[in-house]
Amino acid sequence: LKNLGLDLAIFYSTSKEVFEGFKNQGFDSILCSVDFDDYAKKRDEEIAKIIPMQTFFDSFITHPNDCLKADKTPYKVFTPYYKNLEFIWNSYRLEEFETNKNLKLISYDFDFIPTLENMGFIKQTLPDFLQKNPDELLKDFEQKIDNYKIDRDFFDKNATSNLSVHLRFGLISPRQVFNKIKELRARTENKEFFVRELFWREFYNYILFHFP
């Protein structure tokens, strides 16, 4: 964010209180990435009653309604779902959202950060991979991807990309991961296997959406 001339404001309260505060300060809309789990849907419905929301679809590659069977019902099995999306996963590159160059930083005390103790947490020692940004993890993974298909099943081997947390919290989009994996200097079949795992993540969200 700071590379874009922006910063991150952190709030610790209920969603209702935070967004009522935004409305009282004169904000006219909220822009955010859509989420499909039950909690997120209820939260966003509550927020939308307070202040208009404009959602973007960047947490996943495909929208759950964009891949249906011929009878317009959702898939329940991964393989036919995945085959239906071949035109996507067989692509060399996916289009990514561009950053708005006209975003401006508002006046706010960005140095204020609630402590873990304030929020009822105990400080933990984070694993090494959480100290790295997504680009660093992808660079590390380039050395492991050719053995990923076999080694990923062994817990004693650091064989995965370690990107799950970064994907979940929007530090990198799945489209960016897809594109960066396709660019790696690795055997095509090994890159395709990892891309298939990305679509397993898509399918999990797909099932959650259609069968809550």
Cite the ranges covered by each PLM segment.
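Trp/Phe/Arg-rich N-terminal binding region typifying the photolyase-homology
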Residues: 1-90, 190
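Glycine/tryptophan-enriched, flexible segments
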Residues: 73-211
